[in-house]
UniProtKB/Swiss-Prot annotation:
This is Vacuolar membrane protease. Residues 595-688 are annotated as: Disordered. Its EC number is 3.4.-.-. Zn(2+) 2 binds at residues 206, 241, 339.
């Protein structure tokens, strides 16, 4: 039995290969997305790395919640310091402990390019380390936020280990009187983690795995034979979760200018793979390429830069405030466990630890080997108030199936795009010109007059058939797909939270089926061999137009995220070129016309001979032959008119693409139906397509498929899955409910675009199956409950006790539709009327409140609530400043709110305000956050009233407590000398929920909330207690 050609452009092979190619790409992408590469055996690990030890460390530090404002935080800090000492001693490292901190850096930083290091200053330095225990540094700053600028005072307690590099300066150079000149060599690498968790999570992924990774880096780089060339600083910072405070306090370290590069390890999910969230430049991305399992792309970096992703990490402090260059490696999935009690060791794995650790190890090792000039020198922005980290190169980077890494300059992508914009139309124009010159340009060819013998005959080529099919089908399929997005967003927008793949299946199946229905239907009505070529031409035009905008984005906006378009543009051009070159297999149009006309003449002569020889033949047969000049064929088809002798609708030569019936010109039809010509039998057209199309090659489509699909779909498909995983569960955080669904809809269209040139050849089995998939997923997506035990609805808790009003209110913040069922499951609010107000910062969320007077917090070992906060205030004699003394039991965090703006503040014993972290707003501010490292020491805060002046007395007046004070109705608009009182509200926060008796209202919520819901903290404190005073 003779087997057919498996690559012929027929329904069977096309259905098989298009399905196989897409599945061969998508299935591995999903596998990479859903799995983590296994960790190597202990024997295969780098020297000094022990994953068993790392796992035990993780279990120890995640035994309890350990936010900055908890005693467990101190225990975790002490444990990590003790483990660092143990590792150094085990590796035989002579280390010292340094208490240096609070170094006020000058505003001008030096670089080795401006002040070259003398050869005598640097010599080979032996192995060694210094452990910095910083309990000195504090920072005073303002934190500009839209409509809510606040002052901040923070006392840090970071610790960090400086691993001496072989080319670092000798001795304790950071104690030098001229430390800037010594540190200017600036080749040190900062590796950062934060050891605090949120008050509602155990912090396994955020950020425990990062910190135990730093311990393993310490063990590796202090092992024999692994001393780095450049020094490495392993920073364990505190209070990142509450405002990036630890990284800001590191700004007062004597080593901050020594570190020109950094590796920040973070967690915004709970396990899975650690992704390269963002990086500052190409050089840093190339350092990451040494990772055994790289994962990430420049798209995330561009999204952060444009504010599409608003999550903040210590990366922003190192880059924006210090001017360092480096990268952010972070866990990102599943976000439903982020900042909840499910961020624990049970929901992660050793494999995830290894994925982050291996990336950090490879990147740090690469950065520590760089020369002092690669990341050191004058900045491209010319700023002298930041670390002189050299001139970065904008880049593009992405991974291939989590196994390999591509990184190249953004200028290279721009050159690629520009080359495509200029050369591809020229090449296609030249090829088209050559085809026209050789009379082989069949696209848009209508008819050719041919003279054979004594007569002249017109031969039709059907060169416009199929021209408008693709844009029409694309518009309709896109409109229906986007319409389904809005339908889901209206009815059940959070279904993507737990059933992302169901949403993907719905969008892909809908676009596929509608595209096939329209394109296959058009081909059935008016078969055309040019449909594939026309679709490819449209694809090329679309990508060329989009590339114009991409070039502008690359050149003017430094956006590398458009790199998938360059792939599609390149391959669309190559596919169109193949379709044009295929026409060289056809005869010249005039030759074909003469051939057809000659055959027609021979046929007529043969018919006449037959008539003369058989004059008594049936009259109907004679009549049918006479009608051969006008009818399509003697045999009725689905396009034959119902009434004999009547032309079908749309039978003229100027028929539309989607005509219901049609008639072919005589010569074309005769060639298709004539059975007596051996040459035509050798090249039969497919399914009544144009007669000349039989000579076209039937295998070139497969090359076009392999050009268009594999690389482009791999690159875009990876981004599509990451997009769904990253933002699919952000709706409960207050983000847009439409954006994740719209992302899936648009990306589904873009992923299937390369299939459209071939889809009209797909047999009905595949699209009908996908139609059933669409019906099933549509019903499921519209009706299914969006949350489950593994994908729990996240809501936010806060309890406020107002000592002046005597109120105790619990606020549950979230999407009201689901918060109300949560409240109904809790005993305390039973019977209460629950009122929900709009969140002032996140319009999608609501604050639903209920009275919790029956569950007062016990945050200070039985102390009465009224005695927890002590506050006193006095004004200066001239009425221009206020001194506030504030203390609270068993907490490190308090806030001061003022009834009208103040125009300056200072904390006794604190540093002056640091302009690196924000300027003071000209309109003043009305809130100050106060953080301390100790549990007993109070705050003495001086408030500068600026233009507001309180009544002037000879002696300072002490403030009096009030039961209840209304806010200043004037909004703080006081004039100098106005007799107006200042109302100061102290709000102190408690965050330690490790004991159920401490915050019983919180534990009641945890105990009785539905299985499909999970609670997280709303603000820094799970409990806030407020107390007001007035200064008259």
């Amino acid at each position: 039995m003779k087997l057919g050609n498996p690559f012929v452009f027929r329904p069977g092979p096309v259905s098989f290969w298009t399905t196989i190619v897409y599945l061969a790409i998508i299935i591995p992408l999903i596998y990479v997305q859903e799995t983590v590469p296994p960790a190597p055996s202990e024997k295969e690990l780098p020297q000094g790395v022990n994953l068993t030890e790392a796992w035990l460390d993780l279990e120890v530090i995640t035994r309890s919640y350990h936010p900055f404002n908890s005693h467990s935080n101190d225990i975790v800090r002490e444990y990590l310091m003790r483990r660092s000492r143990d590792i150094l001693e085990r590796n035989g490292i002579d280390y010292t402990t340094d208490l240096t901190g609070g170094v006020p850096w000058e505003s001008r930083y030096l670089s080795s390019a401006e002040h070259p290091v003398q050869a005598a200053e640097v010599s080979a330095r032996p192995r060694g380390a210094t452990l910095f225990d910083d309990r000195i540094s504090n920072v005073t700053m303002t934190n500009p936020q839209p409509n809510n600028t606040m002052g901040r005072y923070f006392e840090g307690n970071n610790f960090y280990v400086y691993i001496h590099g072989s080319e670092d300066p000798e001795g304790d150079w950071w104690t030098s009187d001229n430390v800037q000149r010594v540190a200017r060599n600036g080749a040190g690498v900062l590796v950062n983690c934060h050891f605090d968790s949120v008050s509602t999570g155990y912090g396994a992924t955020d950020d425990g795995m990062a910190c135990i990774s730093l311990l393993q880096l310490l063990s590796h780089f202090t092992s024999e034979g692994h001393q780095p060339k450049n020094g490495i600083v392993l920073l364990f910072n505190n209070a990142e979760e509450d405002g990036l405070f630890g990284a800001q306090a590191f700004g007062y370290s004597p080593l901050v200018q020594f570190c020109n590069t950094f590796v920040n390890l973070e967690g915004a999910g709970a396990g899975g793979r650690a992704m390269l969230f963002r990086t500052t430049d190409l050089e840093a991305a190339e350092a990451y390429s040494k990772s055994p399992h790289p994962f990430g792309s420049v798209v995330a970096s561009n999204a952060f830069e444009r504010g599409v992703i608003k999550s903040g990490t210590d990366y922003s402090v190192f880059v924006d405030n210090y001017g360092q260059r480096g990268l952010d490696i972070a866990f990102y999935s599943p976000r439903s466990r982020y900042h909840t009690e499910e961020d624990d060791a049970r929901h992660t794995s050793v494999d995830s630890i290894w994925h982050m650790l291996s990336a950090a190890l490879a990147t740090t090792e690469s950065l520590a080997r760089t020369t002092s000039t690669q990341f050191n020198g004058p900045r491209s922005d010319g700023r002298k108030d930041l670390v002189q980290s050299g001139r970065p190169t904008a880049g593009v980077w992405f991974d291939w199936y989590g196994s390999s890494w591509s990184a190249f300059a953004l200028r290279g992508l721009f050159a690629w795009t520009l080359t495509l914009l200029i050369t591809t139309p020229l090449v296609l124009f030249v090829v088209t010109y050559l085809l026209v010159r050789d009379d082989k340009w069949y696209f848009f060819a209508t008819k050719v007059d041919s003279t054979v013998g004594d007569g002249e005959e017109t031969v039709s080529f059907g060169g416009w058939k199929g021209f408008v099919r693709f844009p029409f089908a694309l518009v309709v399929a896109t409109a229906l797909t986007i319409g389904s997005v809005f339908l889901l967003a209206k009815v059940n927008p959070l279904i993507i939270y737990s059933s992302g793949y169901s949403v993907w299946a719905m969008m892909i199946s809908l676009f596929y089926f509608v595209s096939w229905l329209l394109l296959r239907g058009a081909h059935f009505v008016r078969p055309s061999a040019l449909q594939r070529g026309f679709t490819l031409i449209w694809l090329f035009i679309i990508t060329w137009v989009l590339s114009v905008f991409a070039a502008v984005a690359e050149d003017r906006m430094n956006m590398g995220a458009v790199y998938p378009l360059a792939f599609l543009h390149t391959f669309a051009f190559a596919a169109v070129l193949i379709s044009l070159l295929e026409q060289y297999a056809l005869p010249a149009k005039q030759d074909f016309a003469r051939q057809v006309s000659g055959e027609n003449e021979e046929e007529e002569e043969q018919e006449q001979e037959n008539l003369l020889g058989d004059g008594g033949n049936d009259a109907n047969e004679q009549n049918n032959e006479d009608r051969g000049d006008t009818d399509i064929a003697a045999t009725p088809t689905e396009t034959t008119p119902l009434r004999a002798g009547e032309e079908g609708h749309g039978s003229s030569e100027q028929t539309t693409t989607f005509a219901n019936t049609y008639r072919r010109p005589v010569p074309e039809t005769r060639v298709e139906t004539r059975s007596g010509n051996n040459r035509k039998r050798s090249f039969p057209p497919y399914e009544n397509e144009q007669a000349w199309s039989g000579r076209l090659p039937t295998w070139t489509w497969f090359i076009q498929l392999l050009l268009l699909v594999p690389l482009y779909v791999t690159v875009l498909g990876n981004l599509a899955l990451v997009q769904t995983t990253s933002i699919g569960k952000t709706g409960t955080d207050g983000s847009s409910l439409l954006a994740p669904l719209m992302g899936v809809g648009i990306l589904a269209i873009l992923l299937l675009l390369p299939l459209t040139p071939f889809i009209h050849r797909v047999s009905h089995h595949v699209p009908l199956f996908l139609f059933l998939v669409f019906i099933g997923t549509l019903i499921y997506n519209l009706t299914a409950f969006p949350f489950s035990d593994n994908n729990r609805f996240k809501f936010y808790f806060k309890q406020v006790v107002d000592l002046d009003k005597g109120s105790n209110v619990v606020t549950l913040n979230g999407l009201e539709e689901f918060v109300r069922p949560v409240i109904s499951s809790i005993p305390t609010p039973a019977g209460q009327r629950i009122h929900c107000d709009e969140d002032p910062f996140l319009s999608n969320l609501r604050n639903c409140q209920y009275d919790a007077s029956l569950l007062p917090p016990d945050v200070a070992d039985g102390e009465e609530l009224e005695s927890l906060i002590s506050i006193e205030a006095s004004k200066s004699k001239n009425g221009k400043t206020i001194l506030v003394s504030l203390d609270a039991l068993n907490t490190r965090v308090c806030y001061l709110d003022t009834s009208f703006p103040i125009f300056g503040f200072s904390v006794h014993g604190g540093a002056k305000r640091d302009d690196r972290f924000g300027s003071f707003p000209p309109e003043g501010l009305q809130q100050i956050q106060l953080w301390r490292r100790d549990w007993e020491k109070g705050w003495n805060v001086t408030l500068h009233l600026g233009g507001h002046v309180l009544p002037m007395n000879e002696d300072s007046v002490e403030a009096t407590e009030v039961d209840e004070v209304d806010d200043d109705p004037s909004g703080g608009e006081l004039k100098r000398g106005a007799a107006k009182e200042l109302i100061v509200t102290a709000r102190c926060a408690w965050s330690d929920a490790n004991s159920a008796n401490t915050i019983p209202a919180f534990h009641e919520v945890k105990q009785f909330m539905p299985r499909w819901a999970i609670v997280a903290k709303k603000t820094v404190g799970l409990v806030e207690i407020t107390k007001k005073i007035k200064v008259a």
